Amino acid sequence: MNLSEIGYRRVVVKLGTSVLTSGSKQLDKAHMVELARQMSALMKAGVEVVLCTSGAIAAGREHLGYPKLADTVANKQLLAAVGQSQLILAWSQLFSIYGLHVGQLLLTQADLHDRERYLNARDSLNALLNNGIIPIINENDAVATNEIKVGDNDNLSARAALLCHADLLILLTDQQGLFDSDPRSNPDAKLIKQVVNIDDSLRQLAGGAVSGLGTGGMATKLEAADIARRAGIEVVIASGHRRQVILNAVCKEDVGTHFTALENPLESRKQWILAGQAAKGKLVLDVGAIKAVTEKGRSLLSKGVVSVIGEFDRGTTLQLIDSDGRECARGISRYSAGDLNKIVGKHSDEIESLLGYDYGDAVVHRNDMVVL
Ligand SMILES: Nc1ncnc2c1ncn2[C@@H]1O[C@H](COP(=O)(O)OP(=O)(O)O)[C@@H](O)[C@H]1O
Ligand SMILES: N[C@@H](CCC(=O)OP(=O)(O)O)C(=O)O
């Protein structure tokens, strides 16, 4: 393996519950050690690895002897709180076989949404990697309510890849990659080896199916792939049980589905906008505004806003959607929902007289916006 010729410096590996449990109800440590071996080999060859691991809830169930618990958020938090310590213990022991230390980062949406916390998380990741320690990331399920949850580890791993400026994201799951329909329900489904563009027809293929203990299925993997490739990060979706899968993916061998990265990655501030999540609010845009924003690279003005959805403060990241609810851009609002409700459809010149102040003509400035 000549990794110096490959060119990847930093790789994020995401392991789904389906991989960690091998489809059973418990952590498959025999398989985890094999994955740790491959990641350790990369670290020793000079390729830095960040591990994004699911499996806390499954590990919690196993550790407590499969208790009968109602399917509530609080009970999932209980299972994650118990299971996360088992999970990190397992990884710490398995990597120690290869002489490597691990460091744990449990993140929530809020850590990615707030610029200062985002930069702090980035510093921690870099400090670990600069010292040859493998960062192990999971969502902080025990404290995350639905509002502050990223929600699935596919998205979390993409955001982590942006955070640490990785150049490859490997999403490992229980299928060989992305198929043209769900291989669980269609045995004739065909593997898609290369994806250059992610559009609505591709999203439809991903459907909603999820393996036994997993969250999100292929749909969240596609979302993750889209976030990463926009930031100039290549993505591979492959089977976590394929022999040498991590090493082969890093050596650019033909494994699973490969997503080409966009050539002009977004600058860092736009990456941060994409790394956070537009959780709190939406603006519905008229046709002219959609065109101005998506085709002409303009800022969004109040005149082009048809309606405001949700309650939010100034400085919140919003989804900019069309009348069918399709998201066309994401950006930071210069006005609160309350203010926006007073100025929708109005000319920018009227803002000061309507509000008694103004924060500029743009409701969402183009420097604070990512067109999707
Ligand atoms: N087009 C598709 N190609 C591959 N898998 C798909 C597709 N559509 C849905 N799936 C489902 O997605 C599942 C993997 O997602 P998930 O259960 O969340 O796994 P993980 O725990 O690895 O994140 C597969 O088992 C498969 O049934
Ligand atoms: N944070 C959760 C996993 C959430 C998740 O996205 O799971 P998966 O679809 O298996 O990657 C856990 O550790 O159990």
From Swiss-Prot:
It is found in: Cytoplasm. Its EC number is 2.7.2.11. InterPro entries: AceGlu_kinase-like_sf, Asp/Glu/Uridylate_kinase, G5K_ProB, Glu/AcGlu_kinase, Glu_5kinase, Glu_5kinase/COase_Synthase, Glutamate_5-kinase_CS, PUA. Substrate binds at residues 54, 141, 153. Keywords: Amino-acid biosynthesis, ATP-binding, Cytoplasm, Kinase, Nucleotide-binding, Proline biosynthesis, Transferase. Gene3D superfamilies: Acetylglutamate kinase-like, PUA domain. ATP binds at residues 14, 173-174, 215-221. GO terms for molecular function: ATP binding; glutamate 5-kinase activity; RNA binding. Residues 280-358 form the PUA domain. It catalyses: L-glutamate + ATP = L-glutamyl 5-phosphate + ADP. Pathway: Amino-acid biosynthesis; L-proline biosynthesis; L-glutamate 5-semialdehyde from L-glutamate: step 1/2. One of its GO terms (cellular component) is cytosol. It is an enzyme of class 2 (transferase). The keyword Lipoprotein does not apply. Its main location: cytoplasm. Signal peptide: none annotated. One of its GO terms (biological process) is L-proline biosynthetic process. Catalyzes the transfer of a phosphate group to glutamate to form L-glutamate 5-phosphate. Belongs to the glutamate 5-kinase family. This is Glutamate 5-kinase.
